[in-house]
């Protein structure tokens, strides 16, 4: 965790959030209450002092630690000069869409100097999620773990001696508000200076003679540790390894997985992976490493991002005879295949009491094929007669089925839907397939040229999709090579989806449906669609409201790789979205929440 100045430390003592659990008697559900004071703080790294945005003086921020069935109450006090929302990433928010915290989708940001209370229940989920700011690029430093423990205190695996959040992130020297402005203007030349592990850059980063501090995890030999690995980064998927040790993957995104042994974890932005690590190595110091991957050229390249920490065994002294073991052998940063194979080996684990929730819908009411890539819009509003192929006459945007989401900064979509006044704000005609089929993964589409120029034209619009309550929805996400060949971590708010299958190349509905896993698929809120490949998911639309769907690469969100799903009310009050709670503050005329 980032070191604080004396003043900041004193500030934390005065206003630090306290978890207040009430009525925890005999395993009954509790109310867990915390306060988040969001403010600016100066931090020095790599010989430069940078202004960052934090919660309660901490980077990463405080952990929200609850038990399944609890009610969570978080009071957010915004001391920033900018608007702010907090999103509870992966929390189902059953009938509490108003508390989802998606800026301009479910609420307008909390105005500077303002406050808001988020109140919601956590039911049917156990494991690791996280929380983060959901406006501009603030989630780079405003984030933290969200842990849900089993109500009966028992895990379907060996109870760990200790559990530890491992929050992988990035260190940005550029002010995050300015970073957002630059990307909105089409400038994507800025990059983070380093990866971080729990806010520490690690000893591979240095300036002059100053070596950056590393995150150190103290362990005892012969015990098991539950590492809750979370990727909060804006730009990159990460490989994570510990020298001399292996992992057993036991959960992801607040759901159990069939135990899977591996020596490396792959975690994309938005994902949370639970792994057991057994400390069965000789007592010593062992490096842990987080390495970002990226597509090879001709895709645009960013500097290699790596952070290194330490596992320190009790009784192991650091001296010339007991130096840390060598770095674990990592994949090449341009090799993205380990990510694909890691995910293909994961399957879901349903406990007896979870069988109903883990039943894959047998029939499909709505089918969507969503292509993910880049495109272009003409400058000046002319959508048909400009030169394509990275021409100065166009602006490059991110697209889903050749629609680039037009983000509003003046109102919240949920309010317009609930009030029955969508006119002039959004339409409900998001396409269920791309405008025309093509070879989605043709490598010749990456450089600008005649092949991709004909596929570039894109609509900049706020086009949503509506589903009736309890409809069974199947989506095939297809990554493309239009101007780039990135993977795409797709996050759906308000839902866990069954990951039926993933594959490379173009999805073939006749051939690839045979690969679907209906028996024990993973349940995930964030699905990594492989580079040059596809992922098929299915879910039951049983949570009414307005739910944001977007790629969790920040530059893809800003460029428009997003939409929202409207799920209609069911036939009863218990299956309908209730009115906004008393603490909910509607949008004002300035695009921020009312005072």
From Swiss-Prot:
* Record note on cofactor: Binds 4 Cu cations per monomer.
* Positions annotated to bind Cu cation 1: 87, 491
* Catalyzed reaction equations: 4 hydroquinone + O2 = 4 benzosemiquinone + 2 H2O
Question: Where does the chain bind Cu cation 4?
Answer: 488, 551, 556, 561
The residues listed in the UniProt record as binding Cu cation 2, with positions renumbered to this chain, are 89, 132, 552
Q: Which cofactor does it need?
A: Cu cation
This entry's Enzyme Commission designation comes to 1.10.3.2
The UniProt annotation puts the region (Disordered) at: 570-595
Record flagged with keyword Ribosomal protein:
no
- UniProt keyword annotations, A-Z: Apoplast, Copper, Glycoprotein, Lignin degradation, Metal-binding, Oxidoreductase, Repeat, Secreted, Signal
Entries under Pfam families matching the protein: Cu-oxidase, Cu-oxidase_2, Cu-oxidase_3
Signal peptide span: 1-29
The answer to whether keyword Signal applies is yes
**Under which name does UniProt file this protein?**
Laccase-18
Q: Where in the cell is it found?
A: Secreted, Extracellular space, Apoplast
Provide the glycosylation site positions.
42, 48, 121, 206, 345, 382, 402, 409, 439, 470
Query: Which Gene Ontology molecular function entries are recorded, alphabetically?
Result: copper ion binding; hydroquinone:oxygen oxidoreductase activity; oxidoreductase activity
**Listed InterPro entries:** Cu-oxidase-like_N, Cu-oxidase_2nd, Cu-oxidase_C, Cu-oxidase_fam, Cu_oxidase_CS, Cu_oxidase_Cu_BS, Cupredoxin, CuRO_1_LCC
